[in-house]
Amino acid sequence: MGAFRFHQYQVVGRGLPTPTDEHPKIYRMKLWATNEVRAKSKFWYFLRKLKKVKKSNGQILAINEIFEKNPTTIKNYGIWLRYQSRTGYHNMYKEYRDTTLNGAVEQMYTEMASRHRVRFPCIQIIKTATVHFKLCKRDNTKQFHKSDIKFPLVYRKVRPPTRKLKTTFKASRPNLFM
């Protein structure tokens, strides 16, 4: 559960106080990174793009890792993102089914790398939310909402009926064909 590559961080920062602006505006951002150092770097990257605040004349007030409240229940997650491809910037909405938001984000990064050849630095997560099962749009997520869902049994191994018939070494390989 806790072995995710990306962790969710909340970074709080502001520009340094100046004689004209003694109480600068405080900005809070939730973002995904592999560690705290990269989370801070990403925070300054976005803040420089959004507001006129740079790392050289700014300060980090707090950085906290955000953990899932109940990481044992399965939820549907919606992720709104923007990514840079070879042809330009694109907006996208993705849905994933996972026990944690970090797991869903991990799935998203893996899928974007495999389907679109877009690596981690080129992806900007705009928003994430838990989506109610009635509001899910993607068929890939909807297929798991049915109560009569069945999974095919593709690997059948015949077990011996009693312990007496169990042997360590077999004379022939087992036939697993169904």
Curated annotation (Swiss-Prot):
<dbReference type="GO" id="GO:0002181">
    <property type="term" value="P:cytoplasmic translation"/>
</dbReference>
<dbReference type="GO" id="GO:0022625">
    <property type="term" value="C:cytosolic large ribosomal subunit"/>
</dbReference>
<comment type="similarity">
    <text>Belongs to the eukaryotic ribosomal protein eL20 family.</text>
</comment>
<keyword id="KW-0687">Ribonucleoprotein</keyword>
<protein>
    <recommendedName>
        <fullName>Large ribosomal subunit protein eL20</fullName>
    </recommendedName>
</protein>
<dbReference type="InterPro" id="IPR023573">
    <property type="entry name" value="Ribosomal_eL20_dom"/>
</dbReference>
<dbReference type="GO" id="GO:0003735">
    <property type="term" value="F:structural constituent of ribosome"/>
</dbReference>
<keyword id="KW-0689">Ribosomal protein</keyword>
<dbReference type="InterPro" id="IPR021138">
    <property type="entry name" value="Ribosomal_eL20_eukaryotes"/>
</dbReference>
<dbReference type="Pfam" id="PF01775">
    <property type="entry name" value="Ribosomal_L18A"/>
</dbReference>
<dbReference type="InterPro" id="IPR028877">
    <property type="entry name" value="Ribosomal_eL20"/>
</dbReference>
